[in-house]
Protein backbone atom coordinates (compact mmCIF):
# COMPACT_ATOMS: atom_id res chain seq x y z
CA UNK A 1 0.00 0.00 0.00
CA UNK A 2 0.96 3.60 0.58
CA UNK A 3 1.64 3.49 4.31
CA UNK A 4 4.93 5.41 4.36
CA UNK A 5 3.64 8.00 1.91
CA UNK A 6 0.54 8.46 4.04
CA UNK A 7 2.69 8.87 7.15
CA UNK A 8 4.69 11.56 5.39
CA UNK A 9 1.53 13.38 4.29
CA UNK A 10 0.24 13.29 7.86
CA UNK A 11 3.36 15.13 9.02
CA UNK A 12 2.96 17.72 6.28
CA UNK A 13 -0.72 18.30 7.04
CA UNK A 14 -1.11 18.05 10.84
CA UNK A 15 -4.69 19.34 10.79
CA UNK A 16 -5.89 16.51 8.53
CA UNK A 17 -6.63 12.98 9.76
CA UNK A 18 -5.09 10.11 7.79
CA UNK A 19 -6.07 6.46 8.13
CA UNK A 20 -4.35 3.77 6.05
CA UNK A 21 -5.63 0.23 5.56
CA UNK A 22 -3.63 -2.96 6.28
CA UNK A 23 -0.45 -1.40 7.65
CA UNK A 24 1.09 -1.02 11.10
CA UNK A 25 2.40 2.55 11.56
CA UNK A 26 0.79 5.32 13.63
CA UNK A 27 1.93 8.64 15.08
CA UNK A 28 -0.50 9.00 17.98
CA UNK A 29 -1.82 12.22 16.47
CA UNK A 30 -3.41 12.35 13.04
CA UNK A 31 -2.30 9.11 11.40
CA UNK A 32 -3.09 5.45 12.03
CA UNK A 33 -3.58 2.10 10.33
CA UNK A 34 -6.58 -0.19 10.44
CA UNK A 35 -7.16 -3.87 9.75
CA UNK A 36 -9.30 -6.72 11.00
CA UNK A 37 -9.33 -10.15 12.60
CA UNK A 38 -10.19 -11.92 9.37
CA UNK A 39 -8.93 -15.15 10.91
CA UNK A 40 -12.16 -15.32 12.94
CA UNK A 41 -14.54 -15.93 10.00
CA UNK A 42 -11.78 -17.91 8.26
CA UNK A 43 -12.00 -20.42 11.11
CA UNK A 44 -15.77 -20.65 10.71
CA UNK A 45 -15.46 -21.12 6.96
CA UNK A 46 -13.07 -23.99 7.66
CA UNK A 47 -15.82 -25.69 9.63
CA UNK A 48 -18.10 -25.33 6.60
CA UNK A 49 -15.45 -26.79 4.29
CA UNK A 50 -14.64 -29.67 6.61
CA UNK A 51 -18.30 -30.61 6.88
CA UNK A 52 -18.90 -30.61 3.14
CA UNK A 53 -15.88 -32.25 1.51
CA UNK A 54 -16.42 -35.81 0.32
CA UNK A 55 -12.95 -36.43 -1.09
CA UNK A 56 -11.28 -34.97 2.04
CA UNK A 57 -9.24 -32.76 -0.28
CA UNK A 58 -9.72 -29.02 0.13
CA UNK A 59 -7.99 -26.45 -2.09
CA UNK A 60 -6.81 -22.99 -1.03
CA UNK A 61 -5.79 -20.34 -3.58
CA UNK A 62 -3.42 -18.01 -1.68
CA UNK A 63 -2.16 -14.65 -2.91
CA UNK A 64 1.13 -14.85 -1.03
CA UNK A 65 3.35 -17.50 0.51
CA UNK A 66 4.54 -18.25 4.01
CA UNK A 67 6.46 -14.96 4.20
CA UNK A 68 3.15 -13.08 4.49
CA UNK A 69 1.62 -13.29 7.97
CA UNK A 70 -1.85 -12.18 6.87
CA UNK A 71 -2.20 -15.00 4.36
CA UNK A 72 -0.49 -17.57 6.57
CA UNK A 73 -2.68 -16.66 9.54
CA UNK A 74 -5.77 -17.07 7.38
CA UNK A 75 -4.67 -20.50 6.17
CA UNK A 76 -3.91 -21.59 9.73
CA UNK A 77 -7.29 -20.41 11.01
CA UNK A 78 -9.10 -22.10 8.12
CA UNK A 79 -7.20 -25.34 8.73
CA UNK A 80 -8.07 -25.30 12.43
CA UNK A 81 -11.72 -24.97 11.50
CA UNK A 82 -11.49 -27.83 9.01
CA UNK A 83 -9.72 -30.16 11.45
CA UNK A 84 -12.17 -29.37 14.26
CA UNK A 85 -14.84 -31.27 12.32
CA UNK A 86 -12.84 -33.43 9.91
CA UNK A 87 -9.35 -34.44 11.09
CA UNK A 88 -8.95 -36.69 8.04
CA UNK A 89 -9.13 -33.82 5.57
CA UNK A 90 -6.09 -32.49 3.72
CA UNK A 91 -5.64 -28.87 2.67
CA UNK A 92 -3.66 -28.08 -0.47
CA UNK A 93 -2.38 -24.54 -1.04
CA UNK A 94 -1.41 -22.95 -4.35
CA UNK A 95 0.21 -19.50 -4.28
CA UNK A 96 -0.27 -16.89 -7.03
CA UNK A 97 2.26 -14.33 -5.70
CA UNK A 98 -0.20 -11.55 -6.43
CA UNK A 99 -3.26 -10.10 -4.72
CA UNK A 100 -4.93 -9.72 -8.11
CA UNK A 101 -3.95 -11.86 -11.06
CA UNK A 102 -6.88 -13.43 -12.90
CA UNK A 103 -4.77 -15.82 -14.97
CA UNK A 104 -2.71 -17.02 -12.00
CA UNK A 105 -5.84 -17.52 -9.90
CA UNK A 106 -7.46 -19.53 -12.68
CA UNK A 107 -4.35 -21.68 -13.03
CA UNK A 108 -4.07 -22.28 -9.28
CA UNK A 109 -7.73 -23.21 -8.95
CA UNK A 110 -7.52 -25.51 -11.98
CA UNK A 111 -4.54 -27.32 -10.48
CA UNK A 112 -6.38 -27.84 -7.19
CA UNK A 113 -9.47 -29.12 -9.00
CA UNK A 114 -7.30 -31.53 -11.00
CA UNK A 115 -6.03 -32.84 -7.65
CA UNK A 116 -9.63 -33.86 -6.82
CA UNK A 117 -10.26 -31.07 -4.33
CA UNK A 118 -14.02 -30.77 -3.98
CA UNK A 119 -14.08 -27.57 -1.91
CA UNK A 120 -12.10 -24.53 -3.09
CA UNK A 121 -11.48 -21.41 -1.04
CA UNK A 122 -9.33 -18.37 -1.66
CA UNK A 123 -7.34 -15.44 -0.33
CA UNK A 124 -7.18 -13.48 -3.59
CA UNK A 125 -9.33 -10.87 -5.24
CA UNK A 126 -11.09 -12.26 -8.32
CA UNK A 127 -14.02 -14.64 -8.50
CA UNK A 128 -12.30 -17.07 -10.86
CA UNK A 129 -11.78 -19.79 -8.23
CA UNK A 130 -15.52 -19.64 -7.54
CA UNK A 131 -16.44 -19.74 -11.22
CA UNK A 132 -14.19 -22.71 -11.89
CA UNK A 133 -15.62 -24.55 -8.90
CA UNK A 134 -19.11 -24.03 -10.29
CA UNK A 135 -18.03 -25.26 -13.72
CA UNK A 136 -16.64 -28.43 -12.12
CA UNK A 137 -19.72 -28.95 -9.92
CA UNK A 138 -17.82 -28.70 -6.64
CA UNK A 139 -18.21 -26.40 -3.66
CA UNK A 140 -16.41 -23.13 -2.99
CA UNK A 141 -16.00 -20.52 -0.26
CA UNK A 142 -15.66 -16.89 -1.29
CA UNK A 143 -13.64 -14.00 0.06
CA UNK A 144 -13.88 -10.20 0.41
CA UNK A 145 -17.58 -9.97 -0.46
CA UNK A 146 -20.51 -12.32 -0.99
CA UNK A 147 -19.46 -14.38 -4.01
CA UNK A 148 -22.61 -16.47 -4.11
CA UNK A 149 -23.89 -13.97 -6.67
CA UNK A 150 -21.15 -15.11 -9.04
CA UNK A 151 -21.29 -18.84 -8.28
CA UNK A 152 -24.73 -19.52 -6.80
CA UNK A 153 -24.53 -23.28 -7.27
CA UNK A 154 -21.05 -23.63 -5.75
CA UNK A 155 -20.49 -20.99 -3.10
CA UNK A 156 -21.27 -22.35 0.37
CA UNK A 157 -20.51 -19.06 2.11
CA UNK A 158 -18.07 -16.16 1.92
CA UNK A 159 -15.63 -14.60 4.36
CA UNK A 160 -16.35 -10.89 4.11
CA UNK A 161 -15.11 -7.44 5.08
CA UNK A 162 -17.40 -4.63 6.23
CA UNK A 163 -15.09 -1.62 6.11
CA UNK A 164 -17.96 0.74 6.86
CA UNK A 165 -17.88 -0.44 10.48
CA UNK A 166 -14.46 1.14 10.88
CA UNK A 167 -15.09 4.19 8.70
CA UNK A 168 -18.20 5.10 10.69
CA UNK A 169 -16.43 4.66 14.03
CA UNK A 170 -13.37 6.63 12.87
CA UNK A 171 -15.36 9.58 11.57
CA UNK A 172 -17.47 9.64 14.72
CA UNK A 173 -14.34 9.69 16.90
CA UNK A 174 -13.07 12.72 14.98
CA UNK A 175 -16.42 14.46 15.43
CA UNK A 176 -16.46 13.61 19.14
CA UNK A 177 -12.86 14.67 19.64
CA UNK A 178 -11.85 11.20 20.87
CA UNK A 179 -9.56 10.25 17.98
CA UNK A 180 -6.17 9.34 19.42
CA UNK A 181 -4.23 8.15 16.38
CA UNK A 182 -3.91 4.58 17.63
CA UNK A 183 -4.15 1.60 15.29
CA UNK A 184 -7.44 -0.25 14.90
CA UNK A 185 -7.84 -4.03 14.77
CA UNK A 186 -11.51 -4.97 14.74
CA UNK A 187 -13.19 -8.32 14.44
CA UNK A 188 -16.57 -10.00 14.36
CA UNK A 189 -17.66 -8.25 17.56
CA UNK A 190 -17.22 -4.92 15.79
CA UNK A 191 -18.89 -6.24 12.61
CA UNK A 192 -15.75 -5.42 10.63
CA UNK A 193 -15.41 -9.02 9.42
CA UNK A 194 -17.96 -11.78 9.11
CA UNK A 195 -19.27 -14.80 7.28
CA UNK A 196 -22.29 -14.82 5.02
CA UNK A 197 -25.33 -17.01 5.47
CA UNK A 198 -24.83 -20.60 4.41
CA UNK A 199 -25.98 -21.62 0.98
CA UNK A 200 -29.66 -22.47 0.81
CA UNK A 201 -28.93 -26.15 0.21
CA UNK A 202 -27.17 -26.34 3.59
CA UNK A 203 -29.47 -24.24 5.73
CA UNK A 204 -31.59 -27.13 6.94
CA UNK A 205 -29.00 -29.90 6.79
CA UNK A 206 -26.06 -28.48 8.76
CA UNK A 207 -25.65 -26.49 11.96
CA UNK A 208 -24.34 -22.99 11.37
CA UNK A 209 -20.56 -22.70 11.81
CA UNK A 210 -21.08 -20.19 14.62
CA UNK A 211 -23.39 -22.56 16.49
CA UNK A 212 -20.98 -25.44 15.99
CA UNK A 213 -17.98 -23.43 17.16
CA UNK A 214 -19.91 -22.19 20.21
CA UNK A 215 -20.79 -25.76 21.18
CA UNK A 216 -17.17 -26.94 21.21
Protein language model annotation of sequence segments:
Residues 92-103:
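Short beta->alpha junction loops
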Residues 42-89, 93, 183-202:
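An alpha-beta-alpha
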Residues 1, 19-21, 115-126, 143:
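Periplasmic-binding protein-like
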Residues 204-216:
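Single conserved hydrophobic/aromatic residue that forms the stacking wall/gate
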Residues 34-56, 159-179:
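Hydrophobic alpha-helical segments within soluble ligand-binding/sensing domains
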Residues 11-35, 145-153:
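Flexible loop/hinge segments that line or gate small-molecule binding clefts
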Residues 102-116:
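Short, well-structured alpha-helical segments in soluble
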Residues 157-206:
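Structured C-terminal subdomain patch of bacterial secreted/periplasmic proteins
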Amino acid sequence: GYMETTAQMAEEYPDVYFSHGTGYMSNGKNFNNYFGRIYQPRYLSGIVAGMNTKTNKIGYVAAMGSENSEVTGGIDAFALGVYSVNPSAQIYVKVTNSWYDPEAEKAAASTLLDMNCDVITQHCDTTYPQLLAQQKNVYSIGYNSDMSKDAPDACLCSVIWNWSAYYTAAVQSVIDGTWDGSNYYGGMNENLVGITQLAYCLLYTSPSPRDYAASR
